[in-house]
């Protein structure tokens, strides 16, 4: 598939206008607990080099990445520990302070944009090392919509692991944790093992990325969707769920009304 967001990476202007080759490094995720994800798959790296002949991708060696080092080397990519020659370094989650290379350009989710106090020291280290940070969270298109976000898969994985936990609690079935599934196909195969009692009831809230991601998982299961009134007031002889929008589980304290714009700007009224 096409990767239009890669144009953003390549369009970044570096300090040297005479640079004939742009070196992009794929860093090893360093957070604890370990994160298996990677910003670009082997196929995407290959596509990137093909689309932009002046781009060379180097992958930092990793024993835990969802794609093995061999999968990158097999298609001709360089896999090594040292990425100090790279102009642009791509990761997924926060980079440990000790692993930050001074005077480089990084792309990753830093979780500092909202002034998160737990990453204040990370942001200070970035400033001290004169690093240019491009945070995926703030990359937007011409319509001011985010280009990159993991909300959907947060919903997918969260819902999957909720059913994993339900199986552990009841002993009715057993499925492997989401992070041990190799792909979406295996996730769906595992879900076929789920067995639910006829009195099982579930409520989904919200139609954002996370809510819709969770809905994807629920719709794969033998659970009938019903409207909220039916859910509350009728008897059911099968597993059911209902999906609530914001106005269905929040109301104004004074008159039980709802105004969406007011709710988001003055949530304390609800």
Regions found by a protein language model. Give the residues of each.
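Short, Lys/Arg-enriched N-terminal segments with co-localized hydrophobic residues
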Residues: 1-18
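An N-terminal-biased, well-structured beta-alpha scaffold segment characteristic
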Residues: 20-125
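Glycine/serine-rich phosphate-binding loop and adjoining beta1-alpha1 elements at the start
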Residues: 23, 97-200
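Glycine-centered flexibility sites
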Residues: 25, 76, 155, 206-211
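Glycine-rich phosphate/diphosphate-binding loop of Rossmann-like nucleotide-binding domains
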Residues: 34-52, 56-59, 177-270
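Short, surface-exposed linear patches
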Residues: 46-49, 79-81, 110-113, 128-131, ...
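Conserved beta-strand scaffold positions in the cores of enzyme catalytic domains, especially
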Residues: 79, 106, 133, 239-243
């Amino acid at each position: 598939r096409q990767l239009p967001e890669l144009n953003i990476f390549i369009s970044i202007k570096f300090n040297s206008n005479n640079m004939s080759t742009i070196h992009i490094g794929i860093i090893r995720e360093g957070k604890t607990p370990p994160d298996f994800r990677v910003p670009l798959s082997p196929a995407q790296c290959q596509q990137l080099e093909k689309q932009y002949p002046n781009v060379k991708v180097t992958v930092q060696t990793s024993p835990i990445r969802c794609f093995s080092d061999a999968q990158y080397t097999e298609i001709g990519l360089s896999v090594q520990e040292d990425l100090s020659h790279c102009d642009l370094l791509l990761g997924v989650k926060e980079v440990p302070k000790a692993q930050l290379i001074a005077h480089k350009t990084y792309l990753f989710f830093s979780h500092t944009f909202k002034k998160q106090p737990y990453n204040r020291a990370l942001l200070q280290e970035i400033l001290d090392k004169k690093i240019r940070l491009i945070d995926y969270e703030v990359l937007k298109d011409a319509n001011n919509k985010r280009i990159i976000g993991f909300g959907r898969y947060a919903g997918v994985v969260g819902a999957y692991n909720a059913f994993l936990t339900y199986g552990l609690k009841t002993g009715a079935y057993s499925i492997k944790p989401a992070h041990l599934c190799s792909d979406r196909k295996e996730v769906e195969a595992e879900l076929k093992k789920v067995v639910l009692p006829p009195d099982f009831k579930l409520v989904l809230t919200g139609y954002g990325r996370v809510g819709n991601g969770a809905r994807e998982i629920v719709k794969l299961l033998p659970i009938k969707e019903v409207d909220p009134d039916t859910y509350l007031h009728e008897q059911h002889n099968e597993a059911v769920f209902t999906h609530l929008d914001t106005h269905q589980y929040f109301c104004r304290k004074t008159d039980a009304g709802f105004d969406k714009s007011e709710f988001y700007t003055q949530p304390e009224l609800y």
